[in-house]
Amino acid sequence: MKTPSWPKRPLALLTAVSLLPMALLASHAQADCERGALDALYCDENGDMVADRPADESSWANPSTLIFAYTPVEDPAIYSDIWQPFVDHLSEVTGRDVRFFAVQSNAAQVEAMRSGRLHIAGFSTGPTPFAVNLAGAVPFALMGSDDGQFGYTLQMFTHVDSDIESLEDLKGKRVAHTSPTSNSGNLAPRALLPELGITPDEDYEVVYSGSHDQSMLGVVARDYDAAPVASEVVERMAARGLYDEEDVRLIYESDRFPTTSYNYAHNLHPDLVEKIEEAFFTFDFVGTELGEEFEGVEKFIPINYQEHWQVIRTIQAANDVRYTRENLE
């Protein structure tokens, strides 16, 4: 398989966050205001689909220690060292201590920001709208190239020795989706494949593997007949030697989707937000472990949720997704 490349602490704090009674947060629900699909904790008076900064300046957060977490798509332990050059840069620019937390689930990550214990986060594509609507996350950056290109594709793989040559051949097969909220691993296939003549759950059996890497390794081991996965994930897996590209066959690839969004909490002090954005947009990937891990990425590029996540919201709407804590798994 050959496709173009693109792109420390214990979990005790985030675990505690996920257990924080939501009743405490509900007590701070905003008075009647325009909020669109946002949770009652937030307002959206300007209609940009993300939470407004609180009008009361006393509610602005200006922590001396910033907590940063990256999406739990793959083995989280790997990323503590990979992200360290950026964490150091973020600390230098903001003048704050910055701590990287490895998270085990999308739900824990969203709950951590919702409760105010997580200040900056990379949320994967599908969970980003949950983070925006449930946790007041404000997406502002993506990884991209110098010419502004960014994103990843949905790729459908099967084992090289299987009898599956096209999507049509998936009928009657056992196909691994990743998780219910994953874009490329579940929602996009459910929205896009029926137009191509194959409907998940009707034409093939869906089983959830739990992650993109487990889906891919399951295809290699022939535990699954096929799997839809994110191109950027399998490319990084191949680069680390986690599977042999010659063991799989690519039978479908979609157009590009936005990749992991980088967000700050809606209630951060505007001066701090300015420094956070400066840190992201001045970080040099060249010669760092982060640059090596995300091959083809050269910088962070500015984005806005309303525009760049429109295709994802459309896919989720087609799947009747509701942005509730119960649906975030």
Regions found by a protein language model. Give the residues of each.
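Periplasmic-binding protein-like
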Residues: 71-72, 146-155, 182-184, 242-314
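Bacterial N-terminal signal peptides
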Residues: 14-23
